[in-house]
Curated annotation (Swiss-Prot):
It comes from Thermoplasma volcanium (strain ATCC 51530 / DSM 4299 / JCM 9571 / NBRC 15438 / GSS1). Its EC number is 3.4.21.-. SUPFAM superfamilies: P-loop containing nucleoside triphosphate hydrolases. GO terms for biological process: proteolysis; regulation of DNA-templated transcription. This is Putative lon protease homolog. Keywords: ATP-binding, Hydrolase, Nucleotide-binding, Protease, Serine protease. Residues 471-495 are annotated as: Disordered. The keyword DNA damage does not apply. ATP binds at residues 52-59. Pfam families: Mg_chelatase, Sigma54_activat. GO terms for molecular function: ATP binding; ATP hydrolysis activity; serine-type peptidase activity.
């Protein structure tokens, strides 16, 4: 054991002193080659196929990849097609265009003023001011809290307006209005000004603001399905066809212009579209089955249509063509699942990316033990509910990693990289420390967790002696004697 390693353990009392890297890829333990290729793939926008057992860092590499590709620069919208509503258009807006639109929309919001700063007649007609006593209150209060008179302006509804106001107030009906239009002098000409109710304030819209609003209203109605401010990392593990490829929601009114919802408003983007300009991560990709074909099509064309997936739905007749789907695919699988990956899909990955075999162990060196300490600190910080670990306890975690490398991978003088299970062991030790009220996870906590954190098969063998004995203890005599019991079956049972 090297002297620097010993000095390090003597210098720092616990893992709270371990520095965690800011670079997400540097937090991946023991997968140096995979990290190097992933950093290149992020810069060059290459696909990745990560092959290896669970818990060796495939998900961490995929998530870290999204930090290197930059923020998206395009927003995807579907626009209403008046001539053929079932075929909405696709509209792509750059970040600059989206920001400009937001500025225009904010400029149409007008100016908010206090009701007391508005003209008296406006405040009364909008329901803020009592026309009798001049008291100001919320427009939702129909009766003045000061004089108990109806607040709506008397005379605004004809000669019987005061009668209607009293009756309306008695039955909880508001007689004031939401908007008042006036003219005011602006230099050498008159301009129209609109006053609107806005909670406890009044919104003032001048002529320029109204003109901007009219320009915005002339634009074709649209719906944003992939916003500009989105997470570039999209997880699609175990996704259904609808989640992966998008859909069009059902409308019980069949998209009727007056009663129903227009088709463009019912379009839903899939994961392949949400990952546009980002990373689409699919763990256990072979579980997608035939859906791999659609992933391949999206990778080839960099666009994929959205259509209704349910033939019985009103959305089945709606289709949006050429929806952008330009993503980096990071797929992951176990070694024994490789034959079940669609051959053209794998060829596409190899043709524009890399296949990486993840390591399961690393050399038991001083540097790698330091990486184990970093891993322990990362797991504790990530959990957020357990204390840090003493160095004596951390030595036991390292020793456990050494044992697992020998037991599972049959490697001597190596440390396991199947770190997910070790992370569970660290959390179990942390829970024990919390239960005891310890400020740090000590050696005894880890030893207790190691005894507790064993596979259930081991516990069954220790308790019952064999799996058959354990099964037998859970079945009745009639179940054991049944010819349909799997223990009583042989090959002739199927003839």
């Amino acid at each position: 054991m090297g002297s620097v390693y010993v000095n390090f353990f003597e210098e720092y009392p616990d893992t709270s002193y371990i520095k965690i890297p800011n670079n997400p890829l540097d937090r991946v333990i023991g997968q140096d080659e995979a990290v190097r290729i992933a950093s290149v793939a992020a810069r060059q926008r290459r696909h990745l196929l990560l092959v290896g057992p669970p818990g060796v860092g495939k998900s961490m590499i995929a998530q870290a990849l999204s930090f290197y590709i930059g923020r998206p620069n395009e927003e995807i919208r579907v626009v209403h097609n008046p001539q053929y509503p079932e075929r909405p258009f696709v509209e792509i807006k750059t970040r600059e265009e989206v920001m400009l639109e937001r500025e225009e929309e904010s400029s149409t919001s007008g100016t908010l003023i206090d009701p007391k700063d508005a003209p008296t007649s406006v405040a009364e007609r909008l329901g803020y001011r009592c026309s009798k006593c001049g008291f100001y209150s919320s427009p939702t209060e129909m009766v003045c809290p000061n004089c108990n008179s109806p607040k709506a302006q008397i005379g605004t509804q004809g000669p019987f307006g005061d009668v209607f106001n009293v009756i309306g107030a008695a039955f909880g009906v508001q007689n004031n209005v939401d908007k008042v239009t006036l003219t005011r002098r602006n230099g050498d000409h008159d301009e129209i000004v609109v006053y609107e109710r806005y909670n406890d304030k009044i919104r003032v819209l001048d002529e320029k603001t109204l003109e901007r609003r009219r320009r915005l209203e002339k634009k074709s109605p649209s719906k944003t399905i992939v916003p500009i401010d989105r997470n570039p990392f999209v997880l699609a593990t175990g996704a259904s066809e609808t989640e992966l490829l998008g859909d069009v929601r059902h409308d019980p009114y069949g998209g009727h212009p007056q009663l129903g919802t227009l088709p463009y408003e019912r379009v839903i983007a899939g994961a392949v579209h949400e990952a546009h300009e980002g990373v689409l991560f699919i763990d256990e990709i072979t579980h997608l089955g035939n859906l791999q074909r659609y992933i391949l099509t999206a990778m080839q064309e960099k666009v994929f249509p959205i259509t209704g997936r349910n033939p019985q739905s009103a959305g089945a007749s709606v289709r949006v063509d050429k929806v952008p789907a330009d993503f980096i695919l990071v797929a992951a699988c176990n070694i024994n699942d490789l034959p079940y990956i669609l051959s053209p899909l794998r060829s596409r990955i190899v043709g524009n990316g890399y296949e990486i075999l993840m390591k399961t162990t690393m050399k038991d060196t001083e540097e790698n033990r330091m990486k184990y300490l970093q891993f322990i600190a990362q797991e504790i910080n990530m959990d957020g509910k357990i204390p840090h670990m003493t160095m004596d306890a951390a030595q036991l975690i390292i020793e456990e990693g050494r044992k697992r490398a020998k037991l599972i991978d049959r490697k001597n003088n190596e440390l396991t990289l199947r770190l997910r299970e070790l992370g569970g062991l660290i959390r179990a030790a942390g829970d024990i420390a919390v239960f005891k009220g310890n400020k740090l996870i000590d050696k005894e906590d880890v030893e207790e967790a190691i005894k507790l954190y064993v596979p259930v098969e081991e516990k069954i063998m220790k308790e019952y002696g064999s799996m058959a004995a354990a099964y037998s203890s859970e079945t009745t005599g009639s179940q054991r004697d049944s010819t349909y019991n799997y223990a009583n079956m042989d090959d002739r049972s199927y003839e």
